[in-house]
A protein has these predicted regions:
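Substrate-binding/active-site clefts of carbohydrate-active enzymes
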Residues: 1-110, 115-141, 158-159
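Conserved alpha/beta catalytic core and glycan-binding cleft of carbohydrate-active enzymes
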Residues: 128, 132-234
C-alpha cells in the first residue's frame, strides 16, 4: 500500500498528497527504514505501492507551486498530473526523483505503479518509459535488482515489452483479470466488470496467458478489447 502522507491517521493511502513524506501515523521515514532493514535481514524483498496518476483532494498544495496538473485530462479520482503539457519536464522529473528516493534512501526493492492507465501522456518519450529507464539505470549503478510492477487494465502487452521492442520497459504487470476470474467463480457475482468472467476456462487462460481478453469481444465494454501477450513470460 502507498505510504505517502495523507489527511488523518487511517487510510488506504491512495489519496496521498506529499509524495516524498512517509505518513506520520506509520512512524515516518525512520520507521520505514527499520521495516525495510528488518525485512532484508530475514531475506524478504520490499515492494512499495506508489501513486503517480493523481494526488488526493485534501491538503494538496502542489498546484500552488507549479503546473503539476492539467485540465486536458481527468482521472476517476480528480485532476490528472501534467506529464505531456507545457513545463511537464519538471513534473516528470519530480516523480522520477520520487521513485529513485524510495530505492536509494529507503532501500525499496520494487515499486508497484498504481493504475498506470490513468497516467495520460501522449509524448514521444512516455513518462512510464522514462521512469523505467531511470530506475533500471539507477539499479545498475547500485548493483541491485529493482523492479517496476504496473497496475494496468488495458490488457496491452506494450506495458511490459522492452523499449527496444516498442514497449515501455516495465518489468511486470498486475493481473487484474486473474483476480476477476477467481472472484466471480467463488462468489457468483456478475455485476460490473465481473460480467465478463465466470468460467474455469477463463481462469486457466488468465493463469497461463496473463489475461483473458486478448482482442476478442468484451460484453461489458461492448467492443473488442486487449491484445495478445504471446511471447511474454508469465
Amino acid at each position: 500500500m502507498p505510504v505517502a502522507e495523507f489527511p488523518g491517521s487511517r487510510n488506504w493511502g491512495y489519496d496521498g498528497v506529499y509524495p516524498f513524506a512517509v505518513e506520520q501515523s506509520y512512524g515516518g521515514v525512520a520507521a520505514l527504514h527499520r521495516l525495510v532493514r528488518a525485512c532484508h535481514d530475514i531475506g524478504l524483498a520490499v515492494v512499495l505501492d506508489v501513486v503517480y496518476n493523481h494526488l488526493g483532494p485534501e491538503g494538496n498544495y502542489l498546484r500552488d507551486f507549479g503546473p503539476y496538473f492539467t485540465d486536458r485530462y481527468r482521472t476517476p479520482w480528480g485532476d490528472a498530473l501534467n506529464f505531456d503539457g507545457p513545463d511537464s519536464d519538471h513534473i516528470r522529473r519530480y516523480f522520477i526523483e520520487n521513485a529513485l528516493y524510495w530505492i536509494d534512501d529507503c532501500g525499496i526493492d520494487a515499486l508497484r505503479l498504481d493504475a498506470v492507465h490513468a497516467i495520460y501522456d501522449k509524448s514521444a518519450y512516455p513518462f512510464l518509459q522514462e521512469l523505467a529507464d531511470s530506475v533500471h539505470d539507477r539499479a545498475a549503478e547500485l548493483g541491485r535488482n529493482v523492479y517496476l510492477i504496473a497496475e494496468c487494465d488495458l490488457n496491452d502487452w506494450r506495458v511490459v515489452r522492452s523499449a527496444s521492442s516498442g514497449g515501455l520497459g516495465i518489468d511486470a504487470q498486475w493481473s487484474d483479470e486473474f483476480h476477476h476470474c477467481v472472484h466471480s467463480l467463488l462468489t457468483g457475482e456478475t455485476s460490473g466488470y465481473y460480467a465478463d468472467f465466470g468460467s474455469i476456462s477463463q481462469l486457466a487462460t488468465a493463469f497461463q496467458e496473463g489475461w483473458v481478453y486478448r482482442g476478442q469481444y468484451s460484453p461489458v465494454r461492448r467492443m473488442r478489447f486487449g491484445n495478445s501477450p504471446d511471447g511474454i513470460q508469465g
